[in-house]
Amino acid sequence: MLCFLRGMAFVPFLLVTWSSAAFIISYVVAVLSGHVNPFLPYISDTGTTPPESGIFGFMINFSAFLGAATMYTRYKIVQKQNQTCYFSTPVFNLVSLVLGLVGCFGMGIVANFQELAVPVVHDGGALLAFVCGVVYTLLQSIISYKSCPQWNSLSTCHIRMVISAVSCAAVIPMIVCASLISITKLEWNPREKDYVYHVVSAICEWTVAFGFIFYFLTFIQDFQSVTLRISTEINGDI
């Protein structure tokens, strides 16, 4: 049986595949339409101009929903594990969830407010998504170590921490270099003064984005043992 069909494993699997498709499809359409330079555009650049803006907005909105669903399920898993065998304060898990949901909210802002139309709002959403997302992965990595070896293998903990560390190392120069760019534009010339800042921040942005994707990929095994039950109760007369 396919691993992503067991339990709730389809949730992080769908998040990973859908988000990857969102980035790749938007990039391909934007490049083929001649709206961006094929060499290292910002992720948001590939979702600014129609028709790719519609594709980007729709797919990133759904990615934000899947991200929230994955994080909430992860929160409930850790909560249940902690009740069975105490390894961490519940507040730590709750803070991680709140930061993760704030990051998903930031993704929604990025999806619905294009960078050239409302750059301040768009950039604010991107900052929320990336910073809160990186902190979320760091906190979840710490939780993973605390629950090892009862609930996680040491290799899984190491993988999560490496991804978190790389994402953390990339998000700082991404923000710094992006803040040094004096103008927001889609096409860049290597001779322009801010071109180096653009390239560095774009590399870091793609690194962090796919760092998130690979991180959620590690959740699939944890979600295989989770079952979702929905109960319906009708109160009062109809």
UniProtKB/Swiss-Prot annotation:
<keyword id="KW-1133">Transmembrane helix</keyword>
<dbReference type="GO" id="GO:0010506">
    <property type="term" value="P:regulation of autophagy"/>
</dbReference>
<dbReference type="GO" id="GO:0005737">
    <property type="term" value="C:cytoplasm"/>
</dbReference>
<keyword id="KW-0458">Lysosome</keyword>
<feature type="transmembrane region" description="Helical">
    <location>
        <begin position="9"/>
        <end position="29"/>
    </location>
</feature>
<keyword id="KW-0812">Transmembrane</keyword>
<dbReference type="GO" id="GO:0005765">
    <property type="term" value="C:lysosomal membrane"/>
</dbReference>
<comment type="similarity">
    <text>Belongs to the DRAM/TMEM150 family.</text>
</comment>
<feature type="transmembrane region" description="Helical">
    <location>
        <begin position="161"/>
        <end position="181"/>
    </location>
</feature>
<dbReference type="InterPro" id="IPR050911">
    <property type="entry name" value="DRAM/TMEM150_Autophagy_Mod"/>
</dbReference>
<comment type="function">
    <text>Lysosomal modulator of autophagy that plays a central role in p53/TP53-mediated apoptosis. Not involved in p73/TP73-mediated autophagy.</text>
</comment>
<dbReference type="GO" id="GO:0005764">
    <property type="term" value="C:lysosome"/>
</dbReference>
<protein>
    <recommendedName>
        <fullName>DNA damage-regulated autophagy modulator protein 1</fullName>
    </recommendedName>
</protein>
<dbReference type="GO" id="GO:0090650">
    <property type="term" value="P:cellular response to oxygen-glucose deprivation"/>
</dbReference>
<dbReference type="Pfam" id="PF10277">
    <property type="entry name" value="Frag1"/>
</dbReference>
<feature type="transmembrane region" description="Helical">
    <location>
        <begin position="200"/>
        <end position="220"/>
    </location>
</feature>
<feature type="transmembrane region" description="Helical">
    <location>
        <begin position="116"/>
        <end position="136"/>
    </location>
</feature>
<keyword id="KW-0053">Apoptosis</keyword>
<keyword id="KW-0472">Membrane</keyword>
<keyword id="KW-0072">Autophagy</keyword>
<feature type="transmembrane region" description="Helical">
    <location>
        <begin position="53"/>
        <end position="73"/>
    </location>
</feature>
<dbReference type="GO" id="GO:0006914">
    <property type="term" value="P:autophagy"/>
</dbReference>
<feature type="transmembrane region" description="Helical">
    <location>
        <begin position="91"/>
        <end position="111"/>
    </location>
</feature>
<dbReference type="GO" id="GO:0006915">
    <property type="term" value="P:apoptotic process"/>
</dbReference>
<dbReference type="InterPro" id="IPR019402">
    <property type="entry name" value="Frag1/DRAM/Sfk1"/>
</dbReference>
